Amino acid sequence: VTDIPQPVPPPHDLAAADPSAPIATRGFFTSLRHLTRSDFGSSIVEFAILLIFSGYFLLYGLMPYFGGSQLGLVGADEPRYAQIAREMLAAHSTDCHEVHARIAPHSLRPNDIHASYECLMGGTVTPILYGKPWLEKPALYYWRAMGFYKEFGVSDWSARLPSASATLALIILAFLHLRRFRPGGHLDAALIMVSSVAIVAFARGASTDMQLAAPFSIGMLGWYAWYETGKKFWLFDLYFFGAAATLAKGPVAPFLAFCIILLFLGLRREWSALRRTIWIPGVLLYLAMVLPWYIAVQRRNPTFFHEFFYEHNVERFATDLYRHHQPFYYYAVVLVVGLLPWTALSFRALVDGLQTSIAEWKARFTPRRYVGHVRAGDAFPEFLVLWALFPIVFFSFSGSKLPGYILPSIPPLAILTGDYLFRIRRAGIPPWLLNTHAIFTGFVTFVLILCPQYLVYQRIVPAPRIFGWAAVLGVAAALLIIFVGRRFGVKHLRLITMVPLTALLYFLLGRNGHLLDLNYSARPLARQIAQATPDGATVACLDVRRDIVYGLAFYRNQFISNYAVQGVPDDAHILVIPTHDADQLQHFLQGRLYQQIFLYETQGLSVYKVYPKT
């Protein structure tokens, strides 16, 4: 039998199974697909998704390099805290210049070390506002803002970077912690956390709220990691980040941590764990971080203890001294709004965690029925439930209530939600819950599209065209979530919910940020005053809102006097007054010449030039 010669295959570069897909290209995409499906590749993809969304929600419209600094400092707290950090930095630079030193000594000689110590202490101990001590809050925010000022210059957006960077650290560390201890729902939890209304809002504020919530939450996760593993290493998180939170807002941080841990261990009857939590190296680390500043500021300001601990902690909780009274149910409303658009899912996850915890507690207090845990991690829902609920319940009894007080409750609720979504992936999300989540997302879309109509144009009834577009887009967002949830399952719910949120943030800041700036910040007013009077004249005010006064003080870097408090300056100056109060000028400026420079109609203000007293 004669062998039949087989055809010789052509060279590989000429033979392709799919002419439209060359082998090299197919090989690249096949390798990429295998990589993304591997544990390492999926981790890289998840982390990239997290960084992209976190960077967008925390920084877009905040920095000049990313959407522009769209909104100036708003409210009274933001410009006040930003100005304190600026004055502390100026005092610090002056003191360092006087001793010809930096924080890092030039050498190990005693004189250089002493000079560096004087430089370190100069301007960093006592918070100062308009040259006087301001002792309402500890110094962590001011220190961090000083660092960003030195790096990027003094600006409103650099004053907000301490909160944005603290939030980013919280999101990343929470993601890594959950990936290590609760894999599966870690990406959902992190994305829910970074996109909730409360986190997005406070992460963009030049305030102390996120300086407390972020390290406090990281420390609590560290404590539970120690509880589950028994490794002392994790207790460093509790004490280190607990100290940072104490330097941010004072004794409320260790108080909340102690109460939550005490409740958790008490309900589990594990009192020995409470004793083991008191770890000497951790306690020493905490004291080494906290005591130097508290001792130093008390020595330099003998009234600090009374003003800070008593007035701004005890009296603030026990009374309505600072006029922040709200009804008892106030934080229920704040929670509903702060968790948007994830409110329905978060409340369902909280109820699920609460049901699990109650069942555990009932079984635990019935010894004959209690057979123990299947795994050590079963206690995590109990811990998260107590962590989420205690600040809400505790501050509901406070005489003063502000939204930021319950910010530490948002991270555990986001974690509960992410874990809940992971656990129901196989069974699927109940239709009523999917529909409710879609309605909440559609409602958020509808309301935020109408926001410029209410906030900028002050329209009770919005323009019909805008109302129609808001309704259509709100319904479209809801239907999109319902379709994806039913067709592709729970796994894709997180990303499809992010689509309208991403567009809404661009709409609010990218398209309407300048309008919000004109109506709610003093920055445009300060710019207009600077253009009209480039000589840097003194500015005074009469019957102007506190946020405008503090805002002008920051943007002009000068104290803004008040006619009703400090009197009328004798020198030439600029006066800012509500337009409807202009008839008071004759009373305050008898015999003085003055003329109107311009009207700032968006905030109902008039600006006058007042000539020197003759």
Predicted segment positions?
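Membrane-embedded architecture of ER/inner-membrane glycosylation machinery
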Residues: 3-6, 14-15, 22-43, 236, ...
